[in-house]
């Protein structure tokens, strides 16, 4: 847009529900300067999904898998910061990257109105009371042919699940993440990304209304992904994920086919493996760097789903019944 203002706006459509929806959005101001004799890049981001503005590939906004099937069932539970609030909120954050090594960000989020969410086909997971604070701190070390990074992040949310006044469900999400990347000469590229989120819950509204059996609860999420790419053309990635939390009969044993848990448990774990081909990824490609396309085959398997391996919903469905093979073509302009 200008030398200091840029936008990223993503609109997604699929044949499953035959609708287009507002996806990720990031509008930001950025500038460079100096502080105490060191370089600093700073700015402000206006975005609709906590973590979508993050510059690294370990948080939900940009972590592996980068796309997935719209048809496949998903586990019933996930920490709020792990994508639950995406497209339903609008937030502003201020960030700074100091001396090409220390990244810090702080801001807050509010939910969009219910009518606006309906117009842009966003989800309806309740309404945030007040402003939900978000923070991020990360250290980055660039060593030329390789780099590594480690950081912290978190968010606190007071959510009214029924869009009414009164008590709120309170969530405190705190996470750690780390990454390593080997670039070498650009021929063989390896990456490892990992994150862990711990969510503490006090479900004042849900407990009072009978939709939760326990006032207090917890939920954790662990992700680990490793990838190898040859000449930026041929690649393979393996990701592992594990979600665990306390049992809650009213919250998870809904009796729903596919989505319920006869064990009243949110525990789910599995893996995703992907092979992909980027035909114009080489530096010598005729289309580099403007022709961007990727063809891939992705398989997601579950060893546990909503608290069980076999008959997890009480209606005969096993965890492996949610395994999904997904083929895709990804193009960017």
Feature-to-residue mapping (PLM):
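Transmembrane beta-strands of outer-membrane beta-barrel proteins
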Residues: 8-10, 43-47, 105-109, 151-155, ...
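Membrane-embedded beta-strands of outer-membrane beta-barrel proteins
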Residues: 25-27, 92, 134-137, 150, ...
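Sequence/structural signature of outer-membrane beta-barrel proteins
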Residues: 12-16, 34, 49-53, 111-120, ...
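Detector for outer-membrane/organellar transmembrane beta-barrel domains
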Residues: 145-281, 286
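Outer-membrane beta-barrel "beta-signal"
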Residues: 273-279, 319-333
């Amino acid at each position: 847009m200008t030398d200091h203002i840029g936008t990223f706006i993503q609109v997604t459509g699929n044949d499953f529900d035959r609708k287009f929806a507002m996806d990720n959005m990031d509008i930001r101001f950025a500038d460079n300067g100096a502080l105490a004799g060191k370089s600093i890049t700073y700015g402000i981001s206006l975005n609709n999904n906590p973590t979508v503005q993050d510059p690294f590939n370990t948080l939900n906004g940009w972590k592996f898998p980068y796309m997935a099937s719209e048809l496949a069932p998903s586990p019933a539970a996930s920490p709020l910061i792990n994508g639950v609030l995406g497209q339903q909120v609008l937030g502003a954050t201020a960030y700074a990257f100091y001396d090409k090594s220390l990244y810090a960000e702080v801001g807050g989020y509010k939910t969009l109105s219910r009518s606006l969410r309906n117009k842009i086909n966003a989800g309806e997971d309740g309404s945030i009371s007040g402003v939900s604070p978000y923070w991020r701190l990360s250290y980055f070390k660039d060593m030329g042919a390789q780099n590594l990074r480690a950081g912290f992040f978190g968010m606190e949310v007071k959510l009214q699940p029924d869009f009414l006044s009164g008590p709120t469900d309170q969530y405190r999400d705190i996470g750690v993440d780390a990454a390593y990347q080997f670039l070498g000469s650009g021929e063989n590229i390896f990456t490892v990304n990992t994150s862990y989120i711990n969510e503490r819950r006090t479900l004042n509204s849900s407990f009072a209304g009978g939709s939760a059996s326990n006032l207090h609860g917890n939920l954790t999420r662990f992700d680990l992904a490793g990838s190898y790419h040859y000449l930026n053309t041929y690649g393979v990635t393996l990701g592992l994920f594990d979600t665990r939390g306390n049992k809650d009969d009213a919250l998870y044993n809904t009796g729903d086919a596919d989505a319920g848990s006869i064990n009243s448990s949110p525990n789910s774990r599995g893996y995703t493996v992907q092979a992909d081909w980027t035909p114009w990824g080489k530096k010598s490609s005729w289309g580099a760097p403007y022709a961007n396309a990727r063809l891939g085959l992705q398989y997601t398997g579950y060893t546990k789903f909503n608290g069980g391996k076999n008959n997890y919903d009480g209606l005969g469905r096993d965890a492996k019944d949610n395994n999904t093979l997904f083929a895709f073509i990804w193009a960017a302009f």
